Amino acid sequence: MKITTSRIETESIGDKGIFETLFREYLSGFSVELDPSVIAQLFALPYFHGFISFVDNKPAGFAVCFESFSTYRAQRVMNIHDFMVSDSFRGKGVGKALLNGIEQYCRDNDYLKITLEVSNDNVAAKNLYSSLDYEDYRVVLKGQQHWQKYLN
């Protein structure tokens, strides 16, 4: 079994089709319909970075990432916003390979860090992230909280 990870080429019709198929599978877990314009809008964002993992050349998972910037450290930051491994490929190392591929891209391009969000009840994901040395912000930045305000 060979696992590979590649960065999505936003101009590639093939990558767009593969991503759309995986993204529909991802959204089905949330009972959400895919707005037909989402992928085009996503691929048009200059700060979008997408990654796809393959097992023996079959699409197996994806990550939607967004680039931001640390004003404190004057370096780019990569945020993993959506992360999914297809049901049929879970438990086979795809998630680890996908995260390692993102990390390698970030190291090669001088990013400061990688951030992500995970639900408290997603034990499998938290175990994966911990195994690769990700840690809760509160461990690193005691006394800080992340807040949000939905606008619609």
What residues fall within each predicted segment?
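Acetyl-CoA-dependent GNAT
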Residues: 3-75, 81, 138-142
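Conserved acetyl-CoA-binding loop-helix of GNAT-fold acetyltransferases
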Residues: 85, 91-104, 127-131
